[in-house]
Amino acid sequence: DLRMSRGLGDVYKRQIVYKGMFLVGQLRTFFRDLQDVDYESAIAMVHSRFSTNTNPSWERAHPNRFIVHNGEINTIRGNADKMLAREETMSSPMLQDELHKVLPVVNTQGSDSAMLDNTLEFLTMSGMDLPLAVMITIPEPWANNDTISQEKRDFYQYYATMMEPWDGPASILFSDGDVMGAVLDRNGLRPSRYYITNDGFLILSSEVGVLEVPEEKIVLKERLHPGKMLLVNTVQGLSLIHI
């Protein structure tokens, strides 16, 4: 079925995206390569919930190319309109007359998650590191925040001239295959909790108890704080950064 095949998933140099309109327990049965005992990955992002603001479809099913998302982006219409308006002034010395082939940046027929994913993909494919792109699109509250450094305040003020916040109650996980991170909206309206185990695993989820972990293996229990980012670099090992 052609319509279904467009939403089955994606394959990249460092990532494979599996998706479908079924329960988590059915995923391995549907995609048989997941049954192979030799199949290994340092990163796994799983999204399992029903759509709230859009009708369910293969194309809108999570994960997206870079993110999984629990929540809503309430500013999505303004965000999408701004991205489309920027296309009028876009230029590229590399693409030149072929720039039109990468436009539009956002697919306005997609979900709010998909349009944010479109934007992050555009920024990273333009040479920006994914964590930086996430900080620009989902900034912490900085304008009247006396607890952040002047350097970070200057960072947000600079990029605020180029990108408006994608705002709303949201917990977002992101990965490019090498780094994996999580960010919580500035108001902390979605839960995100994580464990670190003594055998080197980091487990983050919106609910406690998603995976059964013996208490004696847990070396750290923590939650993601509003507007903050958790980042792990798998190339450098389990380096945990709380930005």
Tell where the protein language model's regions lie, with residue ranges:
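Conserved catalytic micro-motifs used in adenylation/nucleotidyl-transfer and phosphoryl/amide-
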Residues: 44, 57-73, 77, 164-204
